[in-house]
Amino acid sequence: MVKYSQEPGNPTKSAKAMGRDLRVHFKNTRETAFALRKLPLTKAKRYLEDVIAHKQAIPFRRYCGGVGRTAQAKSRHSNGQGRWPVKSARFILDLLKNAESNADVKGLDVDNLYVSHIQVNQAQKQRRRTYRAHGRINPYMSSPCHIELILSEKEEPVKKEADNIVAARKQ
């Protein structure tokens, strides 16, 4: 059994998916995942497809050193720094589709799902080497990551009773 960092509040109304040791940049994937937090599933999938087509940008908030500015990122409530991490978007889109099919098998309403939890962790770095001048060798590392996400059904809030009924009961 794979351990998730957070268990859903209602496991019967949730679907999970996880990817381990994925060969995709950690920093780009973290920013992509943060942009999807609390989005409905249909909007999240459409947003990632737009990122792949370069129609919408992912705003870079934490790992934004040297990242250029674009109007597409400014419209997503950031300072304007953003990119289009296509590979990260494809990996997360595949995981969203996996979690959606898991929800379908569980019998959940797919149109009512939203991304309740998404997290990206660093995986163990993979080492390669590059040869430099004067016989030196430098490391050539990759930064893979683990991605976990949970889709949950929106909880319908309990409707408040009308005031006139409450007043009638008090008398």
Swiss-Prot record:
InterPro entries linked: Ribosomal_uL22, Ribosomal_uL22_CS, Ribosomal_uL22_euk/arc, Ribosomal_uL22_sf
Which keywords does this chain's UniProt record carry?
A: Ribonucleoprotein, Ribosomal protein
- Which Gene Ontology molecular-function terms are recorded? structural constituent of ribosome
Q: Which GO terms describe its cellular component?
A: cytosolic large ribosomal subunit
GO terms for biological process, alphabetical: cytoplasmic translation
Q: Which residues form the signal peptide?
A: none
Please report which protein family the annotation says this sequence is part of.
Answer: Belongs to the universal ribosomal protein uL22 family.
UniProt-listed HAMAP family: Ribosomal_uL22_A
Q: What is this protein called?
A: Large ribosomal subunit protein uL22
Identify the gene encoding this protein: RPL17
